[in-house]
Each structure stands twice: as structure tokens, then as C-alpha cells.
């Protein structure tokens, strides 16, 4: 859609049509896609699906104004889960991204104002705004900390003691230690 016609298997036609409908209805202006991001402070990296400007749209009785969004695209039948907000808050709070020329740039240069997930199905699509505020960011950082402690956790249990000799065969038993 963005660069012209593309060939795709017939079984994906519904998904392609739904994606094109999303792009058209919200007048999506892609700023970046498949964007490599990183955060050295909290030691993580990832690939954000889409940074795009979206037209205003209705949501829960209000209008979300035109904004720059970080969007995660999902096609799973199961839909969108809370973990998607954690994924996107990590992307949004990254320190850097890799530009088109392979250069490292500050994430804030992208001007992301909102995060969302687009559930693309064969019969349509839904956009879910995501909460990527301080509570979500704090939760994400706790999970990152736990992940990085995994290696240390493996050292909590020492190696098995032994081998043990038959006590009757020992001439002088070792002195007990305190």
C-alpha cells in the first residue's frame, strides 16, 4: 500500500485488506517501521513495529487528537494482552534508536506522544490505546530487573555434597565445623 501493489498469498487477502483499511481510515503517515531501539540503563533492546502520525479518532466518548503513535501490530486470533502495554512502554522509553544510516539517535527525537496496539484480523481491525504511564514503566523496570537477576538466582543452590565414604571405613572422622 505504501509503495504500490504487492503480491501476497490469497489466504492473507483479508488481513491485507484490513491493514490497508486501517492505514486509510486513520490517514496513517508512517515515520518509521521495524525500528531497532535500545536502553543501556535497563539493558534491553527490541524492534518497534511502527511509528506513525494518526488522524483524530473517537475513543470511549472522546476524540483522541492527531498524534504521533508508537504502534504494535498483532494478528493473533487471541487479540491484545496487557503484556503489549509492557512491550510498548519499553519501546517508548528506550534511550536510543538506530536511524536509516545505522547511526544512533535519541529516542525523544521521534516525538512519540501515544502508544497503541492494532489487532489486524481477516475481517477487520481494532486500535487499542495503551497505558504507558509511570505505573506501567515501573512494572516494566521491575520485570527487567528480575530478568537480569536470573543468572544470580542459579547460584542460590550450591553443588551437591559428596561423595560420601562409608562411615565405618573412616579411621579418623573429620572435626565438626561451626
What are these regions (language model features)?
Residues 79-83:
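Short alpha-helix boundary/capping segments
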Residues 38, 51-55, 118-120:
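A generic structural motif
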Residues 38, 75-78, 122-123:
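Short acidic/polar capping segments at secondary-structure boundaries
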Residues 94-178:
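Metal-dependent nuclease catalytic regions and adjoining charged, substrate-binding loops involved
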Residues 1-45:
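Metal-dependent nuclease catalytic cores that hydrolyze phosphodiester bonds in DNA/RNA
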Residues 46-58, 62-77, 87-91:
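Conserved catalytic cores of phosphodiester-cleaving nucleases, focusing on short active-site segments
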Amino acid at each position: 500500500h505504501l509503495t504500490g501493489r504487492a503480491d501476497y498469498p490469497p489466504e492473507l487477502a483479508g488481513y491485507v485488506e484490513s491493514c490497508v483499511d486501517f492505514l486509510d481510515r486513520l490517514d496513517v503517515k508512517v515515520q518509521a517501521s521495524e525500528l531497532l531501539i535500545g536502553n543501556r540503563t535497563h539493558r534491553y533492546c527490541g524492534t518497534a513495529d511502527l511509528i506513525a502520525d494518526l488522524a483524530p479518532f473517537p475513543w470511549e466518548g472522546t476524540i483522541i487528537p492527531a498524534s504521533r503513535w508508537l504502534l504494535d501490530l498483532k494478528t493473533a486470533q487471541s487479540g491484545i494482552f496487557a503484556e503489549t502495554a509492557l512491550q510498548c512502554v519499553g519501546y517508548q522509553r528506550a534511550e536510543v534508536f538506530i536511524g536509516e544510516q545505522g547511526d544512533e539517535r535519541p529516542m525523544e527525537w521521534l516525538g512519540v506522544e501515544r502508544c497503541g496496539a492494532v489487532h489486524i484480523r481477516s475481517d477487520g481491525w481494532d486500535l487499542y490505546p495503551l497505558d504507558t504511564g509511570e505505573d506501567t514503566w515501573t512494572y516494566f523496570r521491575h520485570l527487567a530487573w528480575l530478568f537480569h537477576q536470573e543468572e544470580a538466582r542459579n547460584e542460590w543452590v550450591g553443588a551437591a555434597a559428596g561423595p560420601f565414604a562409608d562411615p565405618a571405613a573412616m579411621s579418623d572422622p573429620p572435626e565438626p565445623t561451626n
